[in-house]
Amino acid sequence: MRNESERRAAARRRAEHRGRDAERRVAGWYAAQGFVVLAQRLRTAAGELDLVVADRTTLVFVEVKARNALRSAIESVAPRQRRRLVAAAAIVLAGQPDWGRAETRFDVVLLVGDDVHAIRDAFRADDP
C-alpha cells in the first residue's frame, strides 16, 4: 500500500514540475510577443488560471497543456473545464477591473516537446 501511495505522490510531483515548467515557457513565449504577464497560477473559487497576460488592447486567459502528442493536448480541454475557466475569469475581472481591455479571449497553448502550438481565441465565454 505504501509503495503505491509513494508512486502516486511521485507521479503528482513530476506532473506538477512539468506543468510549472510548461507555464514558464509559455509565459516567456507571450512576453516575446509583447504581452505582459499579469498572473501565473492564479487560484479562484472556480478554479485555477494558468496564465493571465495582456497587451494594450487584449486580455488573455491562457490554459497551458503539456503533452507528448498534439492530439492528446487538444482533447484535454473538455467543455466542463472551459466552463470552469470562464467562471474563474469572471471572478478575476470582478476583482481586478483595471485588467479589463477592449478584447478578452481564451487561448489554449499546447506544448508538445519544444513546440508551442497556440490556439488563439480557442473558445468564448458564451460557448455552450
UniProtKB/Swiss-Prot annotation:
Please give the InterPro entries that the UniProt record associates with this protein: Restrct_endonuc-II-like (IPR011335), tRNA_endonuc-like_dom_sf (IPR011856), UPF0102_YraN-like (IPR003509)
> Could you name the domain of life of the organism this protein comes from?
Bacteria
UniProt GO molecular function = nucleic acid binding
Alphabetized Pfam families for the sequence: UPF0102
NCBIfam families from the entry?
YraN family protein (TIGR00252)
Q: Which family does it belong to?
A: Belongs to the UPF0102 family.
Q: What is this protein called?
A: UPF0102 protein Acry_2261
The record lists the organism as: Acidiphilium cryptum (strain JF-5)
